[in-house]
Structures are given as C-alpha cells and as structure tokens.
Amino acid sequence: MTANQTCGQAAIALLETHGVDTVFGIPGVHTLEFYRGLAGSRIRHVAVRHEQGAGFMADGYARASGRPGVCLVITGPGLTNAATAIGQAYSDSVPMLVLSSVNARDDLGKGRGRLHEITSQQAAMAPLTAFSRTIA
C-alpha cells in the first residue's frame, strides 16, 4: 500500500497482482474505495442487480474457470444478501473471495445504529466460510 492509496485501492491492486481478472458486485456508499481502485486496474467489473447474484456469479465463474471467483459487497445487508451463494460455494469447495466493507473502526461492535451495521460480520460469516476476518 502506498501513502496515497486507500485500503480499498490497495486491495484491488493486490487482487490484480495475484491475477484476478474479473470481480462481481454493486457499487455502494461503503465500497467506493474498491471502485476507485478498479478504475485504474485491468480487472473487469461485472455489475449485478443484487448481491446474491454477485455471489452466484462468482461461484459460477470459479466453477467454469478453475480460478477463484471474487465479489465486492457492501457492509451489512450486502454481505448477508450474498450469504446463500457464499454458503453454497463453501459446501461445494468452490474457491470464492468475498470482500465486504465495514463501518468505521471505532463503530465496530458498538451497536450505534450506523448505516447497514451488523454487530460482527466476521462472526456472521464464520459458519459459511473457511476463513473470515475483519481488517480495519
């Protein structure tokens, strides 16, 4: 990460470094930095109408290509909307990477009623994934 990059931009640069060529998602207020990173990358973005669609498209991409499917979703309901696809990919051992934004670090786990807040996205996804972490 350079001094001028946000975490979202650095995440996209890292995906590109590892050969990711396609991501699925919906731009939203919480994922703007991912999309700022996409603008300067060679990664193709497939816009979807619903996060569940992003998850199933990433799953299908992985099954067809043999490469991990990647989706970008917003915090809270964006992540939970993708949960069915995430669980399906996990149960079938399909490689999928889901990048979800979170609210501000100081708000995590506080129950302050922030936009799209979930107490712990990491805990919500733990039963559906092989690895779930919050990086804030």
Q: What function would you assign to each model-found segment?
A:
Residues 1-136:
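N-terminal alpha/beta PP-like core and its mobile active-site loop of ThDP/TPP-dependent enzymes
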